[in-house]
Amino acid sequence: MGEETIAAIATGAGEGGIGIVRISGADALQVAERIFRPRRGRPLGCRRSHTVTYGWVVTPGGDRIDEALALVMRGPHSYTGEDVVELQCHGGQLAVRRVLEQALQAGARLAEPGEFTRRAFLNGRLDLSQAEAVVDLIRAKTDRAMAAAVAHLRGSLRQAIGRIRERLMEMMAHLEADIDFPELELEVQTREEVAAGCAWCLGEVERLLGGARTGRILREGLRAVLAGRPNVGKSSLLNRLVRENRAIVTPIPGTTRDVIAEWVELGGVPVQLFDTAGLRPTDDPVERIGVARTHEALAQAHLVLVVVDAAAGLGPEDREWISQLPQGAARVGVANKIDLNPAFELSALREALGGAPVVGVSAETGEGFDALEAEVARVAGAFDASEELLVNARQAEAIRRARNHLRDAQATLESGLGDELVAIDLRAAWMALGEVTGETAGEELLDQIFSRFCIGK
């Protein structure tokens, strides 16, 4: 893969002030020289690294396509670790595409998705956790998600994994030396010292796994579902929270027949709000489909906003559907239309929710919405991102396997079985953790990871 010179558009689709075509590989400078004419001075191949040259992108016949800046970055001090040239032209779709076409005609190959970052990984510029952080940084929706991605890009996860693997390697070396050379009087760790090392590694692994759910929330968003009986004002609540008229609102019960999703940021966490069909028995086949989708949304929710009509009071129908809510999600009670019944007893709703927090609001006047947003932000903030070691699903799966192997090693030590069995478990944990940083990752895993990238990254 690394022997070919590749090129791709590195900026997003659509019109913009600047468009970038990235070229990387052993012949990147030669390819760029064939299509770029400096306004004055030496050709690109004679330019120093990390310099900018003004000129024109031209056809083989010398016709000018667009004026551009050429950035020369010689390997290994570039993103990919190879010679890289970036051509910055005007950001029109046609202009950027024409520049890319010239680069391909001059000898470059169109890059595959994620191929630039894959080359950075293969050339030792990034480990696998840092490569994945590039995607997280691009897709970050909040400051907290961005901070976590930047921490991984700096190598925080690599360093944490490295410390655990180093300790595992030290224990393996002592155990295997004693196994292979029993006749020598080597200074080796006692089984008690190995057990203490396993306990330390297990504690570090558990700490990393503690950030798995938070990492998923920051990447994918907190799923907050507005649920309640028909005509309690769920759609009005959604519109007020997202500050636009996104959902249709009428006084007719059952207006909302499908799930509507909108994004909002609260507490530094991206929150995806779902307006749902009202929960009630119905003979209407379309409404039944909507109610079924409401139950599907509830099953996947991180937070359920339990909406009741304060003007009508908390009735037995409300208590019935509240009692049937799936377990696992956080809950916040919302008594809407509180302006029509200021005497509504919030304590009754709190009791029905088993002590969950409740707020009284009015989607009509905006009363109580600061308190509601604060409660949602509190739930979102409960996913602590302070350590910034927020692993993704793939990384968590590898770390869980390492945890299982460490537990097996502990059990082997406690049972008094041979050191060779302990060493096998420790090596398996060491290998599993290596998948996080890519040190023990195979081609199939790399293909899977880098296929998530866009072309040009």
Swiss-Prot record:
It comes from the Bacteria. The keyword GTP-binding applies. Its cofactor is K(+). Transmembrane segments: none annotated. It is found in: Cytoplasm. Keywords: Cytoplasm, GTP-binding, Hydrolase, Magnesium, Metal-binding, Nucleotide-binding, Potassium, tRNA processing. Pfam families: MMR_HSR1, MnmE_helical, TrmE_N. One of its GO terms (molecular function) is GTPase activity. K(+) binds at residues 231, 250, 252, 255. GO terms for cellular component: cytosol. Residues 221-381 form the TrmE-type G domain. GTP binds at residues 231-236, 250-256, 275-278. HAMAP family: GTPase_MnmE. Homodimer. Heterotetramer of two MnmE and two MnmG subunits. Belongs to the TRAFAC class TrmE-Era-EngA-EngB-Septin-like GTPase superfamily. TrmE GTPase family. This is tRNA modification GTPase MnmE. It comes from Symbiobacterium thermophilum (strain DSM 24528 / JCM 14929 / IAM 14863 / T). The lineage of its organism: Bacteria, Bacillati, Bacillota, Clostridia, Eubacteriales.
